Amino acid sequence: MAAAIASGLIRQKRQAREQHWDRPSASRRRSSPSKNRGLCNGNLVDIFSKVRIFGLKKRRLRRQDPQLKGIVTRLYCRQGYYLQMHPDGALDGTKDDSTNSTLFNLIPVGLRVVAIQGVKTGLYIAMNGEGYLYPSELFTPECKFKESVFENYYVIYSSMLYRQQESGRAWFLGLNKEGQVMKGNRVKKTKPAAHFLPKPLEVAMYREPSLHDVGETVPKAGVTPSKSTSASAIMNGGKPVNKCKTT
């Protein structure tokens, strides 16, 4: 009898002890999954945020990379001269094809539209409302030229901004027989003065030039200033043909 009672007491104590140990372990088992889930979620959020930030930085770097595929070239005029830009930005023709002043960046800035930039000077060729060519430190709508292949496979370059008011005839880049640049409204596309043959030296990648207003251009000393308003263009027989937007 006593043995039975003792064994019963021992059994009760053992059960009480097991229950006492089971309770904290159960609470620990219940709390640990939630903690793990919280840690997992936090880690995932941290990982995703880092990946997103890295992706944004990568996209920003890509945007800064050169995206426009153009050429470094010499422009040989059918008159027998290479177009050249002097250090002060003045333009004329030369028969010497070895000078760096005849090197130009031909940068695509639209569909069959290019910017012509002197490699040595970094200045853009521009045409103002009177048809005069001048160098521009900034890329403006006056620096845009339409590039067209003529019947004889020579290339002609016409202003994207100005043309004859009455006839609608385009104004062209051209050199006369003495190798001097001509007013755009005096150059006819059927004449050798307007015919150029690009002689590419290498393919190059360019960043898209930032488009500025024509009024922001500051011509260099000794260079014909830009007459770019609509009034001056109409007074001189020309008119703006469109308002160019940023490409």
Curated annotation (Swiss-Prot):
Disulfide bond entries: none
One Pfam family cited in the UniProt record for this chain: FGF
Subunit structure as annotated in this protein's UniProt entry: Interacts with SCN8A.
Location in the cell: Nucleus
Keyword Nucleus part of the UniProt annotation: yes
UniProt feature, compositional bias: Basic and acidic residues: 15-25
Function: Probably involved in nervous system development and function.
GO molecular-function terms, A-Z: growth factor activity; sodium channel regulator activity
BP GO terms, sorted: adult locomotory behavior; chemical synaptic transmission; neurogenesis; neuromuscular process; positive regulation of high voltage-gated calcium channel activity; positive regulation of sodium ion transport; regulation of postsynaptic membrane potential; regulation of synaptic plasticity
Record keywords, A-Z: Growth factor, Nucleus
Region (Disordered): 1-38, 216-247
InterPro entries the record matches: Fibroblast_GF_fam, IL1/FGF
GO CC annotations, alphabetized: cytoplasm; cytosol; nucleus; synapse
Lineage: Eukaryota, Metazoa, Chordata, Craniata, Vertebrata
Protein name: Fibroblast growth factor 14
PANTHER family: FIBROBLAST GROWTH FACTOR (PTHR11486)
Record family assignment: Belongs to the heparin-binding growth factors family.
Source species of the chain: Rattus norvegicus
